């Protein structure tokens, strides 16, 4: 009987991308990558990274909140810190935008100081376990639908952080349908050609930026990740 070997792949036909919570937390703390403006991809991904995959409880200011799968409860101050906004109202404004896009729903509790949000359709793409237990927020992974990422990227001008995540979500590895992916992960924007090569003009249209800005950001990110 041949020995079993685990193959690591990210194929183009798979409709969602695995994202590690530790990776998102590193991005939150990386002040060298700008998030000004933005399409909302970064903000939505941050919310997903904290969402529960089973029911648990969280106590804030002496009040215990029940948190179901796909939900999380936090203070507005915490939310503003994750989103790196100067004012709390800016963080809440981003929640309003994501809610209008039917990606989340949220309510303000505790006299407006606590936010409880829900990722809509969470169970379609992620685990939703029935039993109650604490959920780790700094380990493990979750799945982000590629279609949702594309919808957000197409909705507005992308920030540097949005671009990092778009490249991550678009990565294909070890798939015979995409050239070069057997050597290492390549960003492939699913245009049906199987060729990952893309022009600055195409990236400019995708991210809502000028070609010069796209070139500058990619060079910056290349230097940052090499360092």
Where are these regions (language model features)?
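Short alpha-helical "packing" element that flanks the helix-turn-helix/winged-helix DNA-binding module
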Residues: 40-47, 163-167
């Amino acid at each position: 009987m041949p020995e079993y070997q685990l193959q690591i792949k990210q194929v183009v036909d798979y409709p969602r991308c695995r994202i590690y919570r530790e990776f998102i937390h590193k991005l939150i703390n990386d002040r060298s990558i700008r998030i000004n403006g933005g399409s909302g991809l970064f903000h939505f991904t941050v919310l997903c990274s904290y969402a529960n995959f089973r029911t648990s409880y969280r106590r804030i200011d002496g009040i215990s909140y029940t948190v179901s799968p796909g939900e999380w409860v936090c203070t507005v101050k915490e939310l503003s810190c994750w989103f790196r906004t100067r004012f709390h109202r800016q963080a809440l404004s981003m929640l309003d935008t994501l809610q209008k896009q039917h990606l989340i729903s949220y309510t303000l509790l505790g006299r407006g100081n606590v936010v409880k949000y829900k990722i809509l359709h969470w169970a379609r793409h992620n685990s939703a376990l029935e039993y109650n237990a604490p959920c780790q927020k700094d380990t493990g992974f979750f799945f982000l639908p590629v279609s949702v990422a594309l919808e957000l990227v197409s909705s507005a001008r992308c920030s540097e952080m949005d671009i990092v995540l778009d490249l991550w979500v678009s990565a294909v590895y070890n798939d015979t349908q995409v050239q070069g992916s057997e050597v290492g992960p390549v960003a492939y924007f699913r245009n049906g050609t199987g060729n990952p090569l893309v022009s600055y003009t195409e990236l400019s249209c995708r991210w809502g930026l000028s070609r010069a800005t796209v070139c500058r950001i990619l060079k910056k990110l290349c230097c940052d990740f090499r360092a």
